[in-house]
């Protein structure tokens, strides 16, 4: 089981290498609408919320990774996201299949993360 320090170390390594990390996503009918992601800019991790189309158009050469936490928290790791073209859309998956539905693991909704951020800013 990875602890917070090792997750942060893995994240730093990926971000400094110019990869992107997805930490939340809004999904409707098996299709991602928007994601919360982190990237490296000017010596620090930067968070942004973008649409799926924005991510498709700006897919980094170093890849995109999903923060995966198994039920109960036994496994915490980053899994590389594969992007492929389906009949009607581009799809993102971490399981190696080409099923025409997005699957980034058990990420929370973006709205949940926005709420957490808003609560943390209360004064």
Predicted regions and their residues:
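Low-complexity, compositionally biased segments
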Residues: 29, 51, 56-57, 61, ...
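Generic N-terminal initiation segments characterized by hydrophobic and/or small/turn-forming residues
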Residues: 12, 34, 52, 101-104, ...
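Intrinsically disordered, low-complexity segments enriched in small/polar residues
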Residues: 17, 22, 28, 41, ...
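Short, surface-exposed binding/anchoring microloops in extracellular/periplasmic proteins
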Residues: 2-42, 48
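Acidic, aromatic-enriched beta-alpha/helix-loop junctions
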Residues: 36-86
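Polar low-complexity intrinsically disordered regions
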Residues: 1-5, 9-10, 104, 120-123
């Amino acid at each position: 089981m990875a602890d917070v320090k090792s997750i942060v170390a893995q994240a730093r390594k990926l971000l400094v290498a110019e990869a992107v990390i997805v930490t939340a996503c809004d999904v409707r009918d098996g299709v991602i609408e928007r994601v919360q992601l982190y990237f490296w800019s000017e010596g620090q991790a930067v968070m942004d919320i973008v649409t799926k189309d924005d991510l498709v158009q700006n897919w980094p050469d170093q890849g995109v990774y999903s923060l995966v936490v198994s039920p109960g928290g036994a496994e915490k790791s980053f899994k590389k996201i594969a992007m492929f073209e389906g009949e009607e859309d581009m799809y993102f998956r971490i399981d190696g299949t080409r099923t025409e539905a997005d699957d980034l693991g058990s990420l929370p909704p973006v709205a949940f993360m926005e709420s957490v951020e808003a609560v943390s800013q209360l004064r």
